[in-house]
Amino acid sequence: MASTTEIDIKKQVFVKNAHLNNLKHIDVLIPKNKLIVITGVSGSGKSSLAFDTIYAEGQRRYVESLSSYARQFLGKLEKPKVDDIKGLAPSIAIQQKVISSNPRSTVGTSTEIYDYMKLLFARIGKTFSPVSGEEVKKDSVTDVIDYIKSSENNVPFLLTAPLNFDIESFTDTLNVLKLAGFTRLEVNGNLAGIEDLESFGFTPEKGMEINLVIDRFSYEEDESFLQRLADSIQMAFYEGHGYCALKNTETGTVKNFSNKFELDGIEFLEPNVHFFSFNNPFGACPTCEGYGKVIGIDEDLVIPNKALSVFEDAVASWKGETMSEWKKDFIKKAKDFPIHKPYHQLTKEQKNYLWKGDGKSTFPSLNNFFKMLEENLYKIQYRVMLSRYRGKTLCPTCEGLRLREETSWVKIDGNNIQSTIELPLDELLPLIQALKLSEHDKEIAKRLLYEITTRLEFLLKVGLGYLTINRTSNTLSGGESQRINLATSLGSSLVGSIYILDEPSIGLHSRDTENLIEVLKNLRDIGNTVIVVEHDEDVMKAADYIIDIGPEAGYLGGELVFAGDYAALKDADTLTSKYLTGRLEIKVPEKRRKAKEFIHIKGARSNNLKNIDVDIPLESLVVISGVSGSGKSTLMKEILTNDIQIQLGIGGKKGDYDSVEFPKKLIKHIELIDQNPIGKSSRSNPVTYLKAYDDIRDLFSKQKSAKMMGYKPKHFSFNVDGGRCDDCKGEGIISVSMQFMADIELECETCKGTRFKNEVLEVKFDEKNISDILHMTVDEALDFFRENKEDKIVTKLTPLQDVGLGYLQLGQSSSTLSGGEAQRVKLASFLVKGVTTDKTLFVFDEPSTGLHFHDIQKLLKSLQALIDLGHSVIVIEHQPDIMKCADHIIDIGPEAGKYGGEVVFAGTPEALAKNKKSHTAKYIAEKL
């Protein structure tokens, strides 16, 4: 390591003596403006270095640099356990977290694309009347002058304004006009002096057209004439309450002008930014208030099996003796409706007819049926029936587009904002690039179009072309959220910063990883230091500098085992190097299992699936692969998991497919193991989840000193009163409310963070109290309990070590676990139960998340162990090492979004490697 005197802080960041968590007082030199990968086995200390040390110190220094007034709102940030960091720049962390749980947040709002779209439509959008399709314009003084200029020379014009009058008080009106200096009126096309009308005692009749004459002139190219003309037109608009007219006195032709924004008898709203905002009451749909969804009748609940026709009882609510009368009535009265056609094959118009009917309240449509139920809510059976079919549904007014109807009348080159936010991003970009605009509009929109297109290009580069602008943020996966954040950062073009990313390749097919690397290099090339915590081999190869933390996890890690480029890493003696060079490898299984029984999915159509049939082998390791957005999760989660849950009687919502068949004897349970947190309580931890803590509490309650004090197992729990600290209620920390500032968390002064009362801590087992046990890592605890022959506890904790989580502390809060760690804790809990459980189908969503090659080896061993116990395992995965170990691969594709949703391949990894159509083939061939 270079001495501190040699460090050039313009070119390097120097981390001195980092000792947070398991980091062993390490010094790290990081080159600036480079792409740096921090790698190492799970739990070796990568995140402690990248996020908890470098990023945390960058944040702290930024906050310290603010005024004391600004700092009071931000709370004090703790200094990380590091002596010093020299050359540190402002730091930005982009982590694997879903951006927002706010139902109003969308891909468009979080990337700012929608903000620019709103501006674009407000600035250059043209409003068209829904009646005639003509453009709505309002006239200005200049428009009237331009019309006069465009006419032939010396044409005599009469400028008039319509007169609003009351027949009874017409004389008073004439008097007021005379006092204002006006002298003439035009009555039914004929000129008359105001004084003449007064002297005749003229009384108008109903329906007469009377205009006030403002001016008479012929056009002259003269400055003073133009000034007079402008004043006259201004006055005409004022007197006519926004209307005026020019009459050619030679030909009698009249041209009407209005400075109101109206056409076809409709007064339109003038577009502005708020008009297109669904977060503003002015622009939001009045029915759903901008959410896009309402609590209403759920189509999926009313028609659970879309493969049936109306005649075959597709409508679940029209079954039974009484309600089936509605079905019979509909069949009798429906004109030209295909009653034998499956629901999913009906056109939009035919579905509308079934739901809305012919518009009459007597027609037996579905909407009228539910209206009848609502009108009879005093009957309990109708209330129950109605609740059965209610759910969150698309808003019937805006159809999920969130905006008021009038916004759809504003268009740019024939496109309204609704149609653009519905398009997949890979279709929206070419549409934006091909807009035909006038030179004037081009000048206005130039910057806006640049911001929109660059952001869209970045989103496409990180493999998100299948998303739409309108997609809500809380429906995205962690990987998608992170890549959206990444694209947003690139769009902001911030330079001179340190970007720290947490495994951006998660959820990406190897093909998309190549594009991601390009994006990371772009971020580096504009003048940033990009630090990536990553296990992906391709990202490592592309890095300028690699830092390997190890050698193992937990207390066996935390050391800097290598720092240098990829070429030098190959010669190093580290686990990463050994796997990269093939000195250690994940071996291909000697033989693949041949399945005898299958799950048969027929006619899967949800989202982008193209009516596909899929056969999935049981009692095997099956991998579902395909590029990001091809339809893997839809097939596995929305169709397979939901249907099996329905058939097993444990809930689930029916998707759009014909049928799912499986042998009941081989699937008694189904478990979807995704990356959602395992517990929301801050007291939830891995040992409570695995039920090992029950045995540990039992053990302590049996100690001699515990019996003397009358302690039961509950005294060693931090979830109930008894032995836990009364001040912090077993949390170990106390949250202090700071009113207008962020709450501060302080260590509890009573128990000093141990969570228990002092007298409970006096109970010891082999010199360790309950707090000491909770602070042990899984590896340390296993050694400790093995020595003491506590086999029951060892049996429950061993699976945590098997899935590569030996570095976790027993009492570590579940809220601090990453998505990948939470998923592996769930896997460990099934390995504990696996021996006794009935045959189960396990569906894993990317279990390799956050795993080093060495940990993947352990994961595969655990998955194979489940299959050996007679269970079935399906894995949605992109990691080539897991794919090559599968008994069967089903590749969905060929592309993402509407270009995907087909079965490209099904068979063994060897056969896939030879397949020409699959994007996966090339990457698996390299591994076999």
For each predicted feature, which ranges?
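Conserved phosphate-binding elements of NTP-dependent enzyme cores
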Residues: 1-928
